[in-house]
């Protein structure tokens, strides 16, 4: 069991220990979050944070890098094996920096890029106007259809019209299988590069719970802390040697300076764990749990975007289902110790800070041992709360139920 920490800085100590209590007592349903292993916590909190070393293994601008070179090479080789790729850069601090580096390796400022819109489940870095991707590039978007699915014929039509240099596939709130082969065909037809952002589904991909883009994408990017259950950060991959050189240059010195070796160590330990048979068992359960979770909401009368899920997440339209916004739903559920995030839905009429939906994910609580029955129970608790948004007495009863559940499923340390 992870113990409370003691620091001379009592204000930070209290905040960390309060967060420990929150993580233990709340049902964590944010799809982009997970609970790392004790080994990964140790690696990230190690003395590697003291070491600086711009450059790449055996090509550093600083001395004393022989040990961090070992760590970085381990992370690289393990990622190659997991994703079946030839080249990997494990240095990106975050998914946003990784996407910036990946796009820059494929396009020049002012070139056209094409990605899924934010409301349809895309990410800020896929061309949203307030992001670098919408500021430095001529960004265009495609949408899901009225049923919440990608329509590849429509995507091809848009691609022919806007003639993108880069097409981005892979999303932050899309609950269905992505057909990377079809995206490759679209990219080839319009002469575009294909960038696959698999940040949400990477863990599913390496365990054969989702098709891999390694055969089709020119460049692949993933964060390492979602379904991969590794340290926070990102990696960029390719099978093209020339693109690999460009990627390396854009990561360093393009967008970053010295690597975070403690974070790279955490990535390496997470990749080691992902290579074990138990990780396959875990990801299988993540998908089973998500399917049952979605089905239970539908049985209880909720409107689930696309009618279900094929992966680790689902989107519930709370505006049409319960007459409340995603923001209010997030607040209600937070008060009964269920943590979710408000999320836009396709064709949303509410703003991104209000939204009509909530996004739910199963990876974190599956790590804590939840199986199908627990997710069915949590769905029922959530629906009771959302149907009665102002019944504070009921909310207290439901919170007590949640606390009894979380007591049985401790954090993984």
From Swiss-Prot:
Pfam families: SHMT (PF00464)
Positions bearing N6-(pyridoxal phosphate)lysine: 226
Cellular compartments per GO CC: cytosol
MF terms in GO: glycine hydroxymethyltransferase activity; pyridoxal phosphate binding
BP GO annotations: glycine biosynthetic process from serine; tetrahydrofolate interconversion
Matches recorded under InterPro entries: PyrdxlP-dep_Trfase, PyrdxlP-dep_Trfase_major, PyrdxlP-dep_Trfase_small, Ser_HO-MeTrfase, Ser_HO-MeTrfase-like, Ser_HO-MeTrfase_PLP_BS, SHMT-like_dom
Cofactor requirement: pyridoxal 5'-phosphate
Keyword Transferase applies: yes
Pathway assignment: One-carbon metabolism; tetrahydrofolate interconversion; Amino-acid biosynthesis; glycine biosynthesis; glycine from L-serine: step 1/1
SUPFAM superfamilies: PLP-dependent transferases
Keyword Transcription regulation: no
Record's catalysed reaction(s): (6R)-5,10-methylene-5,6,7,8-tetrahydrofolate + glycine + H2O = (6S)-5,6,7,8-tetrahydrofolate + L-serine
Alphabetical UniProt keywords: Amino-acid biosynthesis, Cytoplasm, One-carbon metabolism, Pyridoxal phosphate, Transferase
Binding site for (6S)-5,6,7,8-tetrahydrofolate: 118, 122-124, 242
Family under the similarity heading: Belongs to the SHMT family.
Record's protein name: Serine hydroxymethyltransferase
High-level lineage: Bacteria, Bacillati, Mycoplasmatota, Mycoplasmoidales, Metamycoplasmataceae
């Amino acid at each position: 069991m992870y113990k409370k920490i003691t620091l001379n800085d009592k204000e930070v100590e209290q905040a960390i220990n309060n967060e420990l209590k929150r993580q233990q007592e709340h049902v964590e349903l944010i799809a982009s979050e997970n609970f790392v292993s004790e080994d990964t916590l140790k690696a990230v909190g190690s003395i590697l944070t003291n070491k600086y070393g711009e450059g790449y293994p055996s090509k550093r601008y600083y001395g004393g890098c022989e040990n961090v070179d070992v760590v970085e090479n381990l992370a690289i080789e393990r990622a190659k094996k997991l994703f079946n790729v030839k080249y990997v850069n494990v240095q990106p601090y975050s998914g946003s920096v990784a996407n910036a580096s990946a796009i820059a390796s494929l396009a020049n400022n002012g070139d056209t890029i094409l990605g899924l819109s934010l409301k349809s489940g895309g990410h800020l870095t896929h061309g949203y106007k307030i992001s670098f991707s919408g500021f430095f590039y001529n960004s265009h978007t495609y949408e899901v259809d009225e049923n919440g699915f990608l329509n590849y014929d429509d995507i091809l039509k848009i691609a022919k019209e806007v003639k993108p240099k880069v097409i981005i596939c892979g999303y932050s709130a899309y609950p269905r299988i992505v057909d990377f082969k079809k995206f490759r065909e679209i990219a080839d037809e319009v002469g575009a590069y294909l960038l696959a952002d698999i940040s949400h589904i990477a863990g599913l991909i390496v365990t054969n719970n989702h098709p891999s883009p390694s055969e089709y994408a020119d460049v692949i990017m993933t964060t390492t802390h979602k379904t991969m259950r590794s340290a926070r950060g990102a990696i960029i991959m390719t099978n093209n040697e020339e693109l690999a050189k460009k990627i390396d240059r854009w990561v360093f010195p393009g967008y970053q300076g010295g690597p975070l070796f403690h974070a790279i160590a955490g990535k390496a330990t997470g990749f080691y764990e992902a290579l074990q048979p138990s990780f396959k068992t875990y990801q299988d359960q993540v998908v089973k749990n998500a399917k049952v979770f979605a089905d239970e909401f539908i049985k209880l009368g909720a409107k689930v975007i696309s009618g279900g899920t094929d992966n680790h997440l689902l989107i519930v339209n709370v505006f049409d289902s319960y007459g409340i916004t995603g923001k209010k739903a997030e607040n209600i559920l937070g008060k009964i110790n269920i943590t979710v995030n408000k999320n836009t839905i396709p064709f949303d009429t509410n703003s991104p800070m209000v939204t009509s939906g909530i996004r739910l994910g199963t990876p974190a609580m599956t790590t804590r041992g939840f199986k199908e029955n627990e997710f069915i129970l949590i769905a029922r608790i959530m629906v009771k709360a959302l149907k009665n948004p102002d019944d504070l007495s009921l909310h207290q009863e439901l919170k007590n139920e949640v606390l009894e559940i979380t007591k049985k499923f401790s954090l993984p340390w």
